[in-house]
Structure formats: C-alpha cells, structure tokens
Amino acid sequence: IKNGVSDNTIYNVCYGSDGFIWLSTDKGISRYDGFRFRDYPLIMGIDSLSTPLHQAVKKLCEGPDGLYYALLFQGGITCFDKDIEKFLPVRFDKPLELKDILDFCWNDGSLYLVTSQGLFESRIVRKTEGKHDFVLCLLNPEPVVRGKVAHLCSDGKTNLYFSVNQRKVVHYDLVAKKTSLIKEYSVVNRLFLRHGYLWICRLWDDIICYDLKT
C-alpha cells in the first residue's frame, strides 16, 4: 500500500464506529481512513541516545465510552481518545499492578480484566485531576473466576469464553454465575468468537470450530 504503515508489525485490526480501521502495532497504534495511514506512537521513554522507546500494542478494542483500549505486549492497558488524539493512563481504585493485566474484553458496559490472580469485573470512569486526564478502573475485589485465565472473549450479552491453564476452554454464564467446561486440549493458543461460533486455535495443531448454537 502506498503511504502505508511505516515499517511496523501489525498484531491486531479493529474496525471502529467512526468508520476508520485501527491497527495495533509494535510502535503503538495506526489509523487508516481509506486513503492514508496515520501513526500514533506510544512512547514509554527515551534511551541514553535520545531514541524513543515504543510500547508494542497487542490488542485494540473500542469501548462503549468511545475510547480505544489497548493491551500492551509487556503487560498492562492504556486508552486512546481519538477526539483529542491522546493516550490516557489507566488507574485502579484498588491495589493492582498495571503490568498484571494480561487480557480484557467489554461486555454490557463492564470491562472484564484477566490478571495473574484470575478474571475480574470492573467499571470505568473518566477523571480529571488538574491538567491530568485519566481513566479510573473501579475493580470488583472478588474475582469472577480464579486461576490462570487467558484468551478472553464475549458474545456481548451474558456469556464469557476463555481458556484456563492453556488447556481448558471454559464458558462462564454471567447471569447464573457458573462455569462449564467446553473442551480440554493439549495447548490452547487463541480463542475467537464470531457469529455464534467459537474458533479454538491450538499450538501446532488444527483449528477447531465449535458451534455454540447446538
């Protein structure tokens, strides 16, 4: 593509409600408007040679508040406000290391966070202190599910799907507050939920399509 993304590695693609295509890259995020790309580098600091040190973005998702939530490869989460074209830090109302955030997904206005301690539900509030704008995460102190959770996805209604210990594919009913085992495999690498089908990617093995409607 002429005038494409400048030498970046693309990890994830997100189609926003604004009609733009948003890309998570090894240097931050990029926006494609149908004609050209615009890069928004996420800089974590400057090295001894005054070279910017970028944060790689693993996953990008638009929230119900219109902000874009970015999962970082080094662990953690940050937000991007497309209107002011600025990254916003995320803070928590309870003790939690930002780097402990391993995955996330939105469901019915709640932000579900995967941490090293398990799966947590949270609510998001945008705050301003002086000249500093940030996003405050109000965390439920009790985990929804304990254990080594990963690869979180949601149907946007009452169901969450994720892996536990990289082997078990699990369904969680948000209404009944119960978990059920879908299937256990040797190694679960990724999960994707599309149109009632759960796609289960396994390491060095076939991809499984699981029909959730049956």
Where are the regions that the model predicts?
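Carboxylate-rich, polar loop motifs that coordinate divalent cations or form catalytic acidic clusters
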Residues: 1-214
